[in-house]
């Protein structure tokens, strides 16, 4: 599985997930209007939001977390 790990004006960066990590995730942490801290990566299980400002989406295909 290949997941996106970062995005910039120059394109995306991906990584091949290690064995046992069969999900890609994208996590948004709301900071102020129109600005969120976004994290991408691989996971064995879908992470759970730690507070109400956090949204997490998980998926199972290559680069699906773009």
Curated annotation (Swiss-Prot):
Function noted in UniProt: Shows a non-competitive interaction with adrenergic and muscarinic receptors. Binds to alpha-2b (ADRA2B) (IC(50)=2.3 nM), alpha-1a (ADRA1A), alpha-1b (ADRA1B), and alpha-2c (ADRA2C) adrenergic receptors. Reversibly binds to M1 (CHRM1) muscarinic acetylcholine receptors, probably by interacting with the orthosteric site. Also reveals a slightly weaker effect at M3 (CHRM3) and M4 (CHRM4) receptors. The order of potency is ADRA2B>>CHRM1>ADRA1A>ADRA1B>ADRA2C/CHRM4.
Organism phylogeny: Eukaryota, Metazoa, Chordata, Craniata, Vertebrata
Family that this chain belongs to: Belongs to the three-finger toxin family. Short-chain subfamily. Aminergic toxin sub-subfamily.
Name of the molecule in the record: Muscarinic toxin 1
Organism: Dendroaspis angusticeps
More info: Negative results: does not show interaction with adrenergic receptors (ADRA1D, ADRA2A, ADRB1, ADRB2), dopaminergic receptors (DRD1, DRD2, DRD3, DRD4, DRD5), histaminic receptors (HRH1, HRH3, HRH4) and serotoninergic receptors (HTR1A, HTR2A, HTR2B, HTR2C, HTR5A, HTR6, HTR7). Does not show interaction with muscarinic receptors (CHRM2, CHRM3, CHRM5).
Tissue specificity remark: Expressed by the venom gland.
Compartments (UniProt record): Secreted
Pfam family, one: Toxin_cobra-type
Keywords: Disulfide bond, G-protein coupled acetylcholine receptor impairing toxin, G-protein coupled receptor impairing toxin, Neurotoxin, Postsynaptic neurotoxin, Secreted, Toxin
One term under GO cellular component: extracellular region
Listed GO MF terms: toxin activity
Main location: secreted
InterPro entries: Snake_3FTx (IPR003571), Snake_toxin-like_sf (IPR045860), Snake_toxin_con_site (IPR018354), Toxin_cobra-type (IPR054131)
Disulfide bridge positions per record: 3-24, 17-42, 46-58, 59-64
Secreted among keywords: yes
